[in-house]
A protein has these predicted regions:
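Sequence-specific dsDNA recognition surfaces
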Residues: 2-3, 17-69, 86, 91-92, ...
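Hydrophobic residues in beta-strands and at strand termini
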Residues: 10, 100, 135-137, 224, ...
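Periplasmic-binding protein-like
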Residues: 310-316
């Protein structure tokens, strides 16, 4: 058997099998639950192709997946792999149950599959690409040793992510305790439109034909693709010549500005909004991205927390249907609480302290992720 070069890195004493010889699709014969029938709570979790471990719950005992636990579930559209250790029901459309055909430890197989690079084909199905891969089959004792090492490294990464999540939940809880839910306003605060509490600017229509390469004579452009929940991502950056910036001063982003993506603003991990905490090079705002700048830092923290909330989502999506964009009119009309300056300052101090800790946690989580990736690479090349 001729193995493609990308799958020839395995040690000589490992067997290497085509995917279809090593793994089978065991989805057939299982009852699936439609998304509209998910419950918020129930006796049995529903495992679908979403990024979260569970998509919802059901009480349909007769629909429990027939596969022997633990099992691996693959998202045909999302490329997500999940390791499920308790009885579950499959969500409809795109969730596939995978079972080993060869002598494969399921944790080893799970870690191997997760590190495969399956290129995105949009909302197409990806199982066909998975079937083109090959699976290493080391001696079972070696599989278990590798899986145990990777489990420990992954547990460290997940604990650090949990610390980030807890800090974020803490800050949201402080906001609700101090000011109340913006949806119901139980404390009766007066409100003003965002446009009266802060400067709100939407970006300039920089023409892509005039983009340039990064250089000392260029500035960075902040597009919707660069805005993620809580952070800016510059992997796919675009640049503009400094000589063509005359008259565009209002689009220059300053430190602590809030930036909000207005096209497809909600993704699985949250609202695409963040505070700009580090400016390495000048950044200018592109159309369909908004910049929000309050009159003082304390108000800025309140505004950020108010926007990154369920209340803002309901303001923009009153019918709870997915919308492709936020309009400038909706954004500027969003009501912000008017609260005493003493409360503003108190919340700002808590917010600043918590966000500094979150940054430290995020740095530690990135280090853990890099360690896991390094160990994974070594593990599946026989160097661990």
């Amino acid at each position: 058997m001729t193995v493609p070069e990308e799958f020839s890195r395995f040690p000589d004493h490992w067997d290497v099998l085509p995917f279809s010889k090593a793994v089978k699709d065991a989805t057939s014969g299982n009852t699936k639950v439609q998304k509209g029938d998910y419950l918020e709570s129930g006796s049995i979790p529903v495992v679908d192709q979403g990024q979260s471990l569970y998509g919802g719950y059901t009480n349909e005992q007769s629909a429990i997946c027939k596969s022997e636990l633990p099992t691996i579930v693959f998202g045909d559209h999302t490329r997500a792999f999940k390791f499920i250790e308790e009885r579950f029901v499959l969500g409809a459309d795109g969730a596939k149950v995978l079972e080993p055909l060869a002598k494969l430890d399921k944790r080893f197989l799970f870690h191997y599959l997760k590190q495969l690079r399956i290129e995105s084909a949009g909302y197409s199905r990806h199982f066909k690409f998975l079937k083109e891969t090959y699976v290493p089959v080391p001696p079972l004792s070696e599989q278990k040793r590798i899986a145990a090492i990777l489990d420990k490294a992954d547990a460290l990464r997940r604990k650090r992510q949990q610390a980030i999540d807890l800090a974020d939940k803490f800050l949201r809880s402080v906001f609700l305790d101090m000011f109340g839910d913006p949806v119901t306003n139980p404390k009766g605060w007066p409100t003003k439109p965002l446009s009266q509490m802060a400067s709100v600017v939407t970006g300039y229509p920089f023409k892509s034909a005039d983009y340039v390469d990064e250089s000392a004579e260029s500035v960075r452009l902040c597009r919707g693709a660069n805005v993620l929940p809580g952070t800016l991502d510059w992997k796919d950056a675009r640049f503009w010549p400094q000589e063509h910036l005359v008259g565009l001063e209002e689009y220059l982003i300053e430190q602590d500005d809030i930036v909000l993506a207005m096209d497809r603003p909600w993704i699985s991990s949250g609202l695409k909004v963040c505070s700009v905490d580090v400016i390495e090079v000048p950044i200018y705002l592109v159309q369909r991205v908004a910049r929000i700048r309050a009159r003082n830092q304390a108000m800025q923290d309140l505004i950020y927390a108010s926007i990154d909330s369920v209340a803002f989502a309901r303001h923009c999506c009153p019918t709870e249907t997915t919308i492709p964009h936020i309009s400038p009119v909706e954004l500027k009309a969003y009501p912000i609480f008017e609260v005493p300056s003493s409360l503003l300052e108190c919340f700002s101090q808590v917010s600043r302290t918590t966000k500094r800790k979150i940054k430290l946690f995020e740095h530690a989580e990135r280090e853990s992720a890099e360690l896991f990736a390094s160990l994974s690479q070594k593990a599946f090349s026989g160097q661990l």
